[in-house]
UniProtKB/Swiss-Prot annotation:
Homodimer. Binds to DNA and alters its conformation. May be involved in regulation of gene expression, nucleoid organization and DNA protection. Keywords: Cytoplasm, DNA-binding. It is found in: Cytoplasm, Nucleoid. SUPFAM superfamilies: YbaB-like. This is Nucleoid-associated protein Acid345_1974. Belongs to the YbaB/EbfC family.
Amino acid sequence: MGGFNLNEMMAAAKQHAEELQKKMAQTVIEATAGGGSVTVKMNGQKQLLSIKIDPEVVKSGDVEMLQDLVTAAVNEGSRRVDQAMQSNLSGMMGGMGLPGF
């Protein structure tokens, strides 16, 4: 009797989730703000790996602007990680043959 086997589906979902976590841990996203004045890199688990700040921004002495640029770059990086996760998740779920993915 073929058909729906919940245990097999759950095992496959767990395997896909583990694969996705590994893939995202190896993914590195770069995002910028202020026309490249601030650049951040973060991995697919949203861990901040590096921040690069153009020395000219620091020389300006405008701390509030620098804070805003760092915040914007980190938020953009986070948004890009979310997009990468969604894209990878959609691809994996589609491979499982589930409707709607």
